[in-house]
Amino acid sequence: MIRPLTTEQAQAIRAIPHFSRGVYRDIDLDGTIDFYRRRYVEPLGAFTGLGPEDVVADIGTGYGWLAIAFALHTPARIIAVDMDEARLDAARRIAGILGVDHRIDWRVGKLGELPLADGEARVAYCIEVIEHIGRSRAAVRDLGRVASEMIVVTTPNLYFPVIAHDTGLPFCHWLPLPQRARNAKLCGRDARENNNLFWSPRNLLAELPAFRVVSRFLHFASHRDYLVTFPIYVPYVGGGMRRRDGRLKSLYYRAVSMLGRHSLYAMPSLACTLRRRS
């Protein structure tokens, strides 16, 4: 990890109005940057290196943590895209406090109408975004359009029987939206029902025929590469410090990892690294 934030930097970030009103206002800021470094920036090294002429795009950047982590830890040029202009401005201010705002090209836009030229990014990241766009095939194709070499995607897996990102009710996300809403309300989970529409591995890959899966466990090159990220701070609601996965989860992950590139079909997260076919 690069030097910890100073007290002044942390206070300045938490004082940014858009960030200070959000659900992530109390996250561990150092831990958050470290999370994105260890879970996304460093694992890319198993597939490719980055030089100062390479462009990494962070699609749906939110408060910019992934873009900031790439700016802090690689020489690459970064493009950060978000459809919420106010949130993007907050991300730019966070990056400014950390001294890397000049390393990042901030653009307002959305999947399906991305403000990038064809193949402008060597690597495009889309982390926990496509579940919020419906099942827009054009939006996923747009991701393939802007990436000249690689795509890294994470999103809940439609095939998995429970989605923690949603209501967490078994099989509920397989139901039509009206029935999902009724079930969520009946179980006291209506506040977590956001009408997200999830993608299956088959449907996602069908929209990106020019790309093939190269990761063997989630978006990592191996199950071991995932394990060495622990212990780790997880900056999501309900996250916090994780020493390791639980026993049953660890056993399941170990078994599924034996499927190699096909493991994404059985994982709760449809996370994968894709490379353009030669």
Where do the PLM segments sit?
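Conserved N-terminal segment of class I S-adenosyl-L-methionine
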Residues: 1-118, 127, 140, 265-277
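Short N-terminal helix/helix-N-cap motif within the alpha/beta-hydrolase-1
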Residues: 68, 134-138, 163
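A short SAM/SAH-binding and catalytic strip from SAM-dependent methyltransferases
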Residues: 123-134
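A short glycine-rich, Lys/Arg-flanked "PGG" loop and its adjoining helix->strand segment in the class I
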Residues: 137-151
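Conserved class I S-adenosyl-L-methionine
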Residues: 152-179
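Short alpha-helix
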Residues: 193-212
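Conserved S-adenosyl-L-methionine
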Residues: 212-222
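Conserved Class I S-adenosyl-L-methionine
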Residues: 244-271
